[in-house]
Design a protein with these regions (language model features):
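Hydrophobic alpha-helical segments typical of transmembrane helices
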Residues: 10-13, 115, 140
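Low-complexity, charge- and small-residue-enriched intrinsically disordered regions
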Residues: 22-38, 102-126
């Protein structure tokens, strides 16, 4: 599933977008994700290299399932926008058009048609062993995200200063 952490390009992007836009047009708004903390993934890699998970498939997922819309709202709320900005779920054909346009923007695509297609399948745990099989209790996004997205965090303060400069 999606990996989140202090320098991620996922929740931080959604938090920044909400500082600039009055609403968020969102393709794939109802897609499901089970975000996992980068530190839990790193620990799983270490434990696997030490032999605990060697030659096994481990599903690296956090304990909570969200829709993309809920993740966008959580990012906004955690960054100091109560409830986050309104999210406008886009119909599939508009989402495809949005992704096509984003593929051609400078700086790497925020979303591609391939990303959108992959979101049609839920990015959540199945019956395979998870992080707990390595003795790892996955951290909840709802507990970790506010520690790095909050309005008093360095990255957020820089964004606030840039917004005031405009």
């Amino acid at each position: 599933s999606v990996i989140f952490g202090a320098d991620d390009k996922f929740l931080n992007l959604f938090a920044r977008m909400q500082k600039l836009a009055p609403f968020i047009p969102l393709a794939g708004a109802h897609s499901q994700f089970q975000p996992v903390w980068v530190e839990d993934v790193a620990l799983a890699v270490v434990k696997s290299l030490e032999g605990q998970g060697f030659r096994r498939v481990i599903e690296a997922c956090g304990p909570e399932v969200y829709t993309l819309k809920q993740l966008v709202q959580l990012a906004g709320n955690a960054s100091g926008i109560p409830g986050g900005r309104p999210v406008l779920p886009l119909p599939d054909w508009v989402g495809q058009l949005q992704a096509l346009v984003m593929e051609h923007l400078p700086g790497g695509p925020l979303m591609s048609r391939d990303n959108l297609a992959s979101m049609r399948v839920a990015n959540v745990a199945t019956s395979l062993p998870g992080l707990s099989s390595l003795g790892i209790q996955p951290a909840a996004l709802s507990a970790i995200a506010p520690t790095y997205l909050g309005p008093d965090k360095p990255m957020q303060r820089n964004d606030d200063l840039r917004a005031r400069k405009r």
